[in-house]
Amino acid sequence: MKILYPGTFDPLTNGHLDLIERAEKIFGNLVVAVLENTSKTPTFNLERRIIQIKYSLSHLPNIEIISYSGLTVDCANDLKANLILRGLRAMSDFEYELQIAHTNKSLNNDIETIFLSTNTNYSFLSSSLVKEVAKFGGEINHMVPPSVEKDLKEYFK
């Protein structure tokens, strides 16, 4: 079974990292798929985000990191992945993610989506929030891995 965990990861947060670590324990392997979303201007380009993720996940040998563009369901099809992993922080996430899961299922009936609730220590985190705190010089070391913290401080100085 191949499991896909897609996202923009702009930037990777400790919430993402925790979810990846927990999924690796449950499933034994995971493909982290970094989206190149051409309709948005990311803080970090695709190459930098992949480097941040590789560095932050170097202790997990069963994680594959790839990039993709377009529909997540197409990425899953290309990889022959039959399970998409998504994290849930709050009920509002569930409503949005359920809609996406149903859309993916309508595009490929063999695709299933599994939800993992976020660790309560990270339930408040989002990439947007982290960038906002970093932009104004707030402390982010408890929100992101060290390599991401360094990059954000450099970006916003």
UniProtKB/Swiss-Prot annotation:
CDD domains: PPAT
One cellular component term from this protein's GO annotations in UniProt: cytoplasm
Protein origin, superkingdom: Bacteria
Localization, UniProt: Cytoplasm
Site positions per UniProt: Transition state stabilizer: 16
Its EC number(s): 2.7.7.3
Reactions performed catalytically: (R)-4'-phosphopantetheine + ATP + H(+) = 3'-dephospho-CoA + diphosphate
SUPFAM superfamilies: Nucleotidylyl transferase
Pathway(s) annotated for this protein in UniProt: Cofactor biosynthesis; coenzyme A biosynthesis; CoA from (R)-pantothenate: step 4/5
Binding-site list for ATP: 8-9, 16, 87-89, 97, 122-128
Protein's UniProt keywords contain Acetylation: no
Top-level class of the enzyme under EC nomenclature: transferase
Pfam families listed in its UniProt record: CTP_transf_like (PF01467)
An annotated GO BP: coenzyme A biosynthetic process
Gene Ontology MF terms in the entry: ATP binding; pantetheine-phosphate adenylyltransferase activity
Keyword annotations of the record: ATP-binding, Coenzyme A biosynthesis, Cytoplasm, Magnesium, Nucleotide-binding, Nucleotidyltransferase, Transferase
Cofactor(s) needed: Mg(2+)
Binding positions for substrate per the UniProt entry: 8, 40, 72, 86
Family: Belongs to the bacterial CoaD family.
Complexes and interactors: Homohexamer.
HAMAP family cross-referenced by the UniProt entry: PPAT_bact (MF_00151)
Record's function text: Reversibly transfers an adenylyl group from ATP to 4'-phosphopantetheine, yielding dephospho-CoA (dPCoA) and pyrophosphate.
Protein name, as recorded: Phosphopantetheine adenylyltransferase
Lineage summary: Bacteria, Bacillati, Cyanobacteriota, Cyanophyceae, Synechococcales
